[in-house]
Amino acid sequence: LSSSSAASDVYKRQAICIYNPLNHDEVIKKSKKNSKKIFTNKKQLKILNIGRFTEQKDQLTLLKALNLIKKDISFQAIIIGRGKLRNDLIEYINKNKLNDCIKIIDFVENPFPLLKQTELFILSSRYEGLPNVLLEALSLKKFIISSNCPTGPKEILLNGNGGLLFKVGDYKQLAKKISYYQNNKNKCKKLLNHSIQNIKRFDYKTNMQKYLFLIKKFI
């Protein structure tokens, strides 16, 4: 080839995207195991976040957004995880009198029964690789609001056609997205169905077939 750019174009045309595999059936199976009820009021909006308490996961942005909507929306939010910023999050909750609507739960080995109970999953990360937790939430048919962080959420949520995206760190925009979901559940259900229909591309069976194709190609 006469140039590196030409070579690059050839490589792009021949490239195959293989995702970190999701075992959809295993998520469903684990979600059916017995677990205590974490959401006690059926009438409240049920919100869940799962992740380490670090700068990367940025749960503080989520807390700030929830603080903005607390007067307008009745909700119960559960944040599951552990990490060095746990005390900072608890301090913010106490300072803003959010104890009645936000609970922090320590890391659990099997979070899927808890994920199954929620209505809305929120990812507030500043950056990710491919956030498997979003795929797991979709496996259990949960609507997602996610930061538009690098990388993964935009692709998983079909550029906003399969869920709602907000700017990284923008808690005011996140608050608006939560309010939009609460007031437009029928529209959001259509977005969710769109994502669910496209989740097969992340399934381990689909990606194993791609691996087998590559192996056979070079044997």
Regions found by a protein language model. Give the residues of each.
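Aromatic "clamp/platform" in nucleotide-sugar-dependent glycosyltransferases that forms part
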Residues: 107, 126
